Amino acid sequence: QVVSIIGGILTAIFFLGFLVVASIIRTETSSLIIGCLFIITTLTISRRLTVPFLDAMNITLYIAGCALIAYGLNKSTNALFIALAITGIFTFFLSKGFILPFLSVILFIISFLGELAYLSSSIQLLQIAVVPVLAVFLFTNLYERDILTGLKENLVSKYTPFHSGLFVSCICLLAGLSVNYGIPAPYWLLSIFIWIGILLIIQ
């Protein structure tokens, strides 16, 4: 899965470069339309075929589609993050397999925090926004058996990519906040919640 994701990301970069060089993408509107077509194509392939070797192609089209949608909405940051969050939600429930639901969880969380960062540049708000993500990840770890028992049969397959997406998102969020650790800010807010989570896990 890791190799497929890395390969898909690299292919998406080269593919986007080709679209730019070939002048296929000339305006924000064309970028938005092509991006939506890529997302729809990816979801269609994912629902009809779950062949492993198609994972890399789905990743390529999905990442390229999200990047094109972001470029098409770059003049409206608020609409950009909302559109990406909605894309993540639809992808999670409409796609099959592991890769796309996994990426959709990461996309939704990034869009959610990006929207908060756009609305407020306060580091305190971002710390508070990280707490629900960490809390959901902690909850899924503590009550994994109960969650799997209570889920409907068609949603059980979504648990693994959901949990994996939360795990990767938590690592990226904590790493991202630590980059600006030298800037004076009340980081003790996030530290308190992290210690509470550790104590709950120990118990």
PLM feature spans:
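Alpha-helical multi-pass membrane segments and their bilayer interfacial helix-loop junctions
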Residues: 1-203
